[in-house]
Amino acid sequence: MKTNYDVCILGGGLAGLTLSLQLKQANPKISILVIERRKGEAPDSAHKVGESTVELGTYYLREVLNLKDYLDEHQLPKEGLRFFLTPQHKDDISKRVELGPKATVPVPSHQLDRGTLENELAKRAKKLGIKILFNAKVSNININEER
């Protein structure tokens, strides 16, 4: 296994994987290692913070990381922030009062399934030559100042 990389990213979740992809886009020759403590792929139903994106987050995923087609095909569109009120109808959400924009929001956003998104990001990272090391724990960091 290769032991020297230009960049080592600790954490193979949404932030680490998107950073690795953006760095590789900026410099295709850079060598990147992503270290993740999880034993393998993320579970498809990984309920995490960041599932409901705002427009700026979606812009980054769609335009900067070129995930537009993937998001449109595999993730749910989100039509702005919505609230469902009146708890008298707990069993049927369609009978609750809904508060939110009446028109389609001009800038798209998505309700993300983080597990499937992170697995897609990992797949794209590997395809670009980014090494992902699963089931790893960082206990010490040595910085080579000569590089």
Where are these regions (language model features)?
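Conserved Rossmann-like nucleotide-cofactor binding loop
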Residues: 15, 19, 40
